[in-house]
A protein has these predicted regions:
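Ser/Thr- and Pro/Gly-biased, low-complexity intrinsically disordered regions
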Residues: 1-3
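Alpha/beta-hydrolase superfamily serine-hydrolase fold, recognizing
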Residues: 5-291
Length: 291
């Protein structure tokens, strides 16, 4: 997979008008967390910030990977500050760090960003991520609510979230796990990734590990959400279900189905479907400015 993404981005022009910097903060386990900060070069006054939590099933890939650098640049060029988090994941280059290490790092990054709003010129904070990053996005909001830090988040934008953990034997209400199996994403592979994230299987119903299992008491009082799903994604129905749970709990939530696309296609295939990619970038930035 590491070799797959550079091919997709080869030959694309650089994104203009973006300033980049790097910060290192301390994690709860004494670990260092690298933050990649992308700012619009022409910003005047405070602008929204997006805390970006990258995809990879909470087990693979890294914030420094080309596809995620590109996404942060594209968002920043549209007028927001973007902070990418190099969180520990369950099977990546930083070593095997299963749940809850990655969530701990995302929470640390959120609290750092909230504490540095004025310094960074940030008006609002949106937590956002795709796939496994969508899991961490929703879990970060759930944890912030549980810990009394929900005021640090102004909005939540989760793309194709990987949140049920029910991949070995999908329930009937998550029909897309069977109907869309093999469209870019295969169910056996996401079941393996889930087992890497929770190797002893002790957190299968813990909403902080798998937000699909959150109940009304977990969701009530959360900030506005936006959920996007891909029509041909095995994960489609769990994202839709989470949106409905949010609405039932009285949380403001919108949902967007990206028709004719496979898992995360709107944030991966920049060259092949540039109009869809641009639409998703605009929608995320528009959500941040709407808060």
């Amino acid at each position: 997979m590491q070799d797959f993404f550079p091919i997709l981005y080869a030959g694309l022009p650089e994104v203009a008008g973006v300033l980049r910097s790097v910060e290192t903060i301390d994690g709860v386990d004494g670990n260092a967390i690298t933050l990649y900060i992308h700012r619009p070069a022409t910003a005047t006054g405070d602008v929204p910030a997006i805390l970006h939590l990258h995809g990879g099933g909470m087990a693979l890939l890294a914030a420094v990977d080309e596809q995620f650098v590109r996404w942060r640049d594209e968002l920043a060029a549209r007028g927001v500050v973007v902070v990418g988090v190099e969180f520990r994941n369950a099977g990546g280059a930083l070593g095997p760090h299963p749940f809850p290490a990655g969530l701990d790092d995302c929470t640390s990054a959120l609290l750092w960003l909230h504490a540095h709003r004025a310094e960074l010129g940030v008006s609002k904070i949106v937590v956002s991520g795709e796939s496994g990053g969508g899991n961490l996005t929703l879990a970060t909001a759930l944890r912030a609510r549980r810990d009394g830090n929900v005021d640090a988040i102004d909005g939540v934008y989760a793309q194709c979230p990987y949140i049920s953990g029910l991949y070995a034997d999908p329930p009937s209400q998550l029909a897309s796990l069977r109907e869309n199996d093999g469209y870019f994403l295969e169910r056996w592979s996401i079941a393996v990734t889930a087992s890497i994230y929770d190797p002893e299987g002790r957190h299968g119903s813990n909403p902080l590990a798998w937000p699909y299992h959150a109940g009304t008491d977990d969701l009530t009082g959360l900030p506005p959400h936006a959920i996007t799903v891909n029509e041909l994604d095995p994960l489609r129905d769990e994202g839709l279900a989470y949106h409905h749970k949010l609405r039932a709990a009285g949380v403001s939530s919108t949902c967007r189905v990206i028709v004719g696309t496979s898992h995360a296609a709107d944030v991966i295939f920049r060259a092949a479907i540039p109009d869809v990619y641009a639409s998703s970038a605009r929608d995320l930035v528009g959500f941040a400015y709407s808060l």
